[in-house]
């Protein structure tokens, strides 16, 4: 940045769906603001991330953030220069303008000036971009760094993951504060009607049965409930086991094929094996675990597996030691999967959910929730077994090549002796010898494969 050596000018632009004009000031200028009252998987809903950038910029350079956005099909492009009134938690609009959208552009562009040390941050920024490309192989990214270096990441596919749908919260997933907000927005209605209209998987009969079981009249007006009754109802909602399971179409996993493509593009390994587990849930929150292992190629050998962690397609760079993924990976007996360290092994885990259970407010590690831990363990074991099959085959191929080399080492001398005895050409004998050797090696490989399958089934029981 021209004014100061330690100031950085950061500009980010996408070609997404854009932000409605009236929402822009609040989205960027009000902490914990969200216009959503329904649930679905989000990379983020502008709760803290963008606001922390603005507040840091304010405190170090006293400059506003510039936001330019246009929705798809909009005739106008809108610009706001925004700061945050930290006392009132309100946006301060420093400048505002709009112009005709001549080129039918849509998306959002953000410009911010903040204090920073690029030399220290460079590695982490580049690593973050690399990891985004791993779970978004359909994205194209162009990054120009302060030192003039350019990172161009081309998309490797035009296939997109299925976007998440929006839905109502599950009754097991809400807290007292959320229910109070729902009550304040829903006016006068019977408690049973309130539950049917505001929670997923709750029909009239289910609502009536639940309310009767906790001693609340289904026909009573929701506004008549006092704080103790609301607290009692929410507590029992979490304990009740007759609710329908949370829907999984609120989620958008990367998908096995896209995950493999992203890993191949980013890490350039020798082999990749990925899986997407079936949907599961914890405390009424649906989630899906995806895992992959990458082996060899340009992966450097390490004394333990290198881990890449993602939550709702967002890379997690810090606090790995407190993450459930690190704990599970460290518990795996990799000897069962024919991995001997140091080894060129990477483990990738992506967890998507309507509510990621982070271990701390920093949102850099996922907590040890039993349901999630179990799914992570099963996913890693599944891809590790496929890696074991691959490594076993490689081992057998190597042994077969050594056998072939050993047999053929003296084949010419043997062929020469046989040819002189039989009075035929040496090449004719040599060709027949090679065919016999190949048949013999294939026969031995077939026997070993049958024996190996039995051994693998035994190990699979242990794993």
Give the label of every model feature segment.
Residues 2-10:
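Short beta-strand-loop-beta element adjacent to the nucleotide/active-site pocket used for signaling
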Residues 8-9, 21-23, 34-181, 220-233, ...:
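GHKL-type ATPase core
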Residues 14:
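Acidic ATP/Mg2+-coordinating residue in the GHKL
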Residues 17-18:
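Glycine-rich G1-box
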Residues 25-27:
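ATPase catalytic-site recognition across NTP-hydrolyzing enzymes
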Residues 151-177, 206-209, 216-220, 300-395:
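GHKL/Bergerat-fold ATPase module
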Residues 178, 184-187, 198-202, 233-239, ...:
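Charge-rich (often acidic), low-complexity intrinsically disordered regions concentrated
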Residues 192-213:
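Helix-hairpin-helix
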């Amino acid at each position: 940045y021209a004014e100061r050596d330690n100031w950085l000018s950061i500009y980010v632009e996408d070609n997404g769906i854009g932000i409605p004009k009236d929402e822009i000031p609040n989205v960027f200028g009000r902490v914990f603001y969200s216009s959503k009252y329904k649930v679905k998987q989000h990379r983020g809903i502008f709760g803290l991330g963008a606001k922390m950038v603005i507040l840091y910029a304010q405190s170090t350079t006293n400059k506003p953030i510039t936001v330019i956005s246009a929705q798809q099909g909009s005739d106008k492009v809108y610009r706001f220069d925004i700061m945050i009134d930290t006392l009132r938690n309100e946006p301060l609009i420093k400048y505002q303008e709009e112009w005709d959208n001549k080129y039918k552009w849509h998306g959002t562009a953000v410009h911010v000036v903040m204090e920073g040390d690029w030399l220290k941050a460079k590695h982490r920024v580049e690593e973050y971009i690399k990891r985004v490309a791993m779970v978004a192989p359909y994205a194209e990214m162009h990054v120009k760094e302060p030192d003039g270096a350019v990172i161009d990441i081309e998309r490797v596919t035009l296939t997109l993951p299925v976007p998440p749908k929006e839905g109502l919260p599950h009754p097991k997933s809400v807290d007292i504060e959320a229910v109070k907000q729902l009550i304040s927005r829903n006016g006068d209605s019977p408690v049973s009607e309130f539950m049917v209209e505001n929670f997923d998987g709750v029909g009239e009969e289910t609502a009536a049965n639940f309310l009767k079981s906790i001693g609340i009249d289904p026909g009573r007006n929701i506004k008549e409930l006092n704080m103790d009754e609301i607290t009692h109802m929410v507590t029992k909602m979490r304990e009740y086991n007759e609710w329908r399971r949370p829907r999984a179409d609120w989620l958008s996993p990367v998908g096995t094929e896209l995950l493999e493509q992203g890993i191949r593009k980013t890490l350039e390994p020798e082999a990749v094996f990925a899986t997407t587990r079936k949907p599961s849930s914890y405390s009424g929150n649906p989630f899906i675990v995806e895992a992959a292992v990458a082996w060899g190629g340009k992966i450097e050998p390490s004394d333990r597996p290198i881990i890449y962690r993602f939550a709702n397609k967002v890379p997690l760079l810090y606090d790995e030691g407190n993450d459930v993924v690190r704990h599970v990976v460290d518990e795996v007996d990799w000897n069962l999967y024919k991995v001997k360290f140091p080894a060129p092994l990477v483990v990738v885990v992506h967890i998507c959910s309507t509510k990621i259970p982070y271990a701390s407010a920093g949102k850099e590690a996922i907590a040890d929730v039993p349901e999630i831990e179990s799914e992570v363990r099963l996913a890693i074991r599944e891809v590790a077994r496929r890696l074991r099959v691959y490594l076993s085959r490689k081992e057998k191929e190597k042994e077969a090549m050594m056998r072939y080399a050993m047999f053929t080492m003296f084949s010419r001398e043997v062929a020469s002796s046989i040819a002189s005895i039989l009075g035929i050409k040496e090449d004719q004998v040599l060709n027949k010898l090679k065919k016999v050797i190949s048949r013999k090696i294939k026969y031995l490989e077939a026997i070993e494969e049958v024996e190996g399958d039995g051994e693998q089934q035994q190990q699979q029981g242990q794993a």
